[in-house]
């Protein structure tokens, strides 16, 4: 089968090469079609997303991407946001769990974040009223709320999860977040076997750093989902172990949550675990469940052993050496 590979910026090319090598070692038979996107692509060709990229993704429906840089406060819109809106990948799925061998304050985190991916403040509707006043529109619609809430409950049912928690700020934003919360409760009533509750976003942040094991599935509007995704990654060792899937009706785009890390780009220092875990999510959705499980097991075993690991978790191995170690475990 064909799938699109977008290395992205910074460390993207190095970790994308890890994916290629691991894919070959697993004999997946995937034919990778590589395209450029991001700041480096713009500098080289004048195009943020290389010509042919969108057509290729639409044709095959599957893509795996590395990190892309986004300028702060000015410049072009996030490539991630553009891709999500272009392909209506309405659900961003981010599993978070403790990894043996990674030093953290918690040893029992196992939760999933389901983030609405297409609207909210990320719709990009903002403008200057004058030189001193900027305005941004928080767009929340019932269809999008219903779709993401139903996705969260369906995911919980399919994966044996027991509770879904809605994340909101409806005490202040009574119309927008109020609509999200009301829709959540309506959908929850259709899944009586799954517990449903809700939590205000600021209170949730406190509870996550106090007792994260009390949460199972978190469903959130776009902005809150983005914020708590990084928070939860910090609970389990950082963004080096944070994969995600952007899921639409006909397209799925998998990626690591972390950034492009330009400070270590080209130095063979990047931890490829997150993008390899995202690749495992992709394999699982392709029906290659045994290969996905084998890859996840290899990553977990390598990290738990702690001998050949990257600097972000206390090791001295480079990207290439760590990847070779994973491939060796796949051959066992």
Region annotations inferred by a language model:
Residues 39-43, 207-307:
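Glycine-rich phosphate/nucleotide-binding loop
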Residues 2-8, 63-67, 164-170, 278-284:
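Short glycine-rich or small-residue beta-strand-to-loop segments that form or flank ligand, phosphate
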Residues 42-135, 223:
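N-terminal glycine-rich phosphate/adenylate-binding segment common to multiple enzyme folds
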Residues 19, 23, 184, 208, ...:
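Buried hydrophobic packing segments
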Residues 9-12, 61, 114, 152, ...:
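Buried hydrophobic positions in well-ordered alpha/beta secondary-structure cores of metabolic enzymes
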Residues 30-52, 208:
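N-terminal beta-loop-helix "entrance" segment that forms/cooperates
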Residues 31-33, 159-168, 191-199, 288-296, ...:
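Flexible, glycine/charged-enriched surface loops at secondary-structure junctions
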Residues 4-26, 130-202, 214:
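Glycine-rich phosphate/diphosphate-binding loop of Rossmann-like nucleotide-binding domains
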């Amino acid at each position: 089968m064909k799938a699109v590979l977008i290395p992205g910026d910074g460390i993207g090319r190095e970790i994308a090469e890890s994916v290629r090598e691991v894919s070959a070692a697993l004999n997946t038979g995937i034919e990778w079609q590589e395209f450029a996107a991001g700041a480096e692509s713009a500098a080289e060709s004048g195009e943020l997303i290389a010509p042919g990229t969108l057509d290729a993704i639409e044709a095959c429906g599957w893509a795996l991407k590395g990190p892309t840089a986004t300028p702060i406060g000015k410049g072009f819109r996030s490539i991630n946001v553009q891709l999500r809106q272009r392909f209506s990948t309405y659900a961003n799925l981010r599993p978070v769990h403790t990894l043996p061998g990674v030093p953290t304050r918690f040893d029992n985190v196992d939760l999933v974040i389901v983030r609405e991916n297409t609207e909210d403040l990320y719709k990009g509707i903002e403008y200057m009223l004058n030189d001193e006043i900027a305005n941004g529109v928080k767009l929340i619609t019932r269809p999008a709320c219903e779709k993401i809430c139903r996705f969260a409950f369906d995911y919980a049912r399919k994966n044996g999860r027991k509770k879904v928690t809605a994340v909101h700020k409806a005490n202040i934003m009574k119309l927008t977040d109020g609509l999200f919360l009301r829709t959540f409760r309506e959908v929850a009533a259709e899944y009586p076997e799954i517990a449903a509750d809700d939590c205000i976003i600021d209170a949730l942040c406190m509870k996550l750093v106090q007792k994260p094991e009390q949460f199972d599935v978190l469903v959130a509007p776009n902005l809150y989902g983005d914020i708590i995704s990084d928070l939860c990654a910090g609970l389990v060792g950082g963004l080096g172990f944070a994969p995600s899937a952007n899921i639409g009706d006909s397209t799925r785009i998998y990626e690591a949550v972390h950034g492009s890390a330009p400070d270590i780009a080209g130095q063979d220092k990047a931890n490829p675990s997150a993008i390899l875990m995202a690749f495992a999510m992709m394999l699982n959705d392709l029906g290659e469940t045994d290969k996905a499980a084998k890859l996840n097991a290899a990553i977990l075993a390598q990290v738990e052993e702690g001998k050949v690991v990257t600097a972000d978790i206390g090791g001295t191995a480079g990207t290439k050496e760590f990847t070779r170690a994973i491939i060796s475990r796949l051959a066992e």
